[in-house]
Regions:
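N-terminal, polar/charged subdomain of small-to-medium soluble alpha/beta proteins
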Residues: 4, 8, 71-77, 83-180, ...
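Ubiquitin-like/PB1-type beta-grasp interaction modules and other compact soluble beta-rich domains
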Residues: 1-86
Length: 235
């Protein structure tokens, strides 16, 4: 059976390609598929301990059996945060500049009395090293779905929320540019808009497949998170 494998960020660079189509026997598991890939692309083994797996755009266990036409993605822990095709108005991955005012306007409704907005901005230093610019990469189809999941989780925790919008910018971003914006509205400031906004950006950094590469005078480096999602983070 034919399986499509997509690779992102450091794993894409280690393999030297972003997509691999591979023929495997029936009932092959994800773990067995990865073993085959590491044989054909030995450099991938160096990142095995920090590799996250998704199956058909959601998190999956290594012992899951694959089927004809499945899409497996391999990527490192996400580092997103600080409309393209497939994005909708309130949950978007985009190459275009993003605005705090525009995002706030998306969540203002007649019963809105409070809006909390978080903006992640590209800074010129990270970990004590100078930074010239950042490059963001995303597994776009899965990322939009996970942005919606983050919003749904926030609504469940703070049911008085009126609306929520999240947009992540990808591509090359210069110092001072907005990388990610979260906007949350509620009837009153005490109805959860602050808490939901903070929850959303923190959760984005855990489960939304977005990565960043920092470039400065000392060269370029992929920045990886430390949260390892599991099937409990699946929708």
């Amino acid at each position: 059976m034919k399986i499509k494998v997509k690779l992102f960020a450091r794993l894409r660079e280690l393999a030297g390609t972003n997509t691999i189509e591979i023929n495997t026997p029936e009932n092959t598991t994800i773990a067995e598929l990865i073993e085959t890939l590491q044989t054909e692309y030995p450099k991938l083994a160096a990142a095995a301990a920090n590799t996250i797996v998704s199956l058909n755009k959601d998190f999956a266990e290594l012992q899951t059996h694959l089927h004809e036409g499945d899409e497996v993605a391999l990527f490192p822990p996400v580092s997103g945060g600080s409309g393209s095709a497939g994005s909708d108005e309130k949950f978007a991955i985009t190459y275009d500049p993003i605005s705090l005012d525009d995002m706030a306007a998306k969540v203002v409704k007649p019963k809105t009395g409070a809006v909390a907005v978080f903006g992640g901005v590209v800074r010129n230093i990270s970990g004590g090293k100078d930074v010239d610019f950042l490059e963001y990469e995303a597994y776009e189809a899965m990322a939009v779905a996970k942005l919606k999941q983050v919003a749904a989780e926030a609504r469940e925790k703070w049911p008085k929320i009126v609306d929520i919008a999240i947009t992540q910018r990808i591509g090359q971003l210069d110092i001072g540019e907005n990388a990610v914006i979260v906007a949350v509205s509620s009837p009153h400031r005490g109805d959860g808009c602050f808490e939901a906004c903070a929850y959303a950006i923190n959760r984005l950094k855990e489960i939304v497949p977005i990565w960043k590469k920092e470039t400065g005078p000392d060269g370029s480096e992929w920045i990886e998170g430390d949260y390892m999602p599991s099937t409990t983070d699946a929708q």
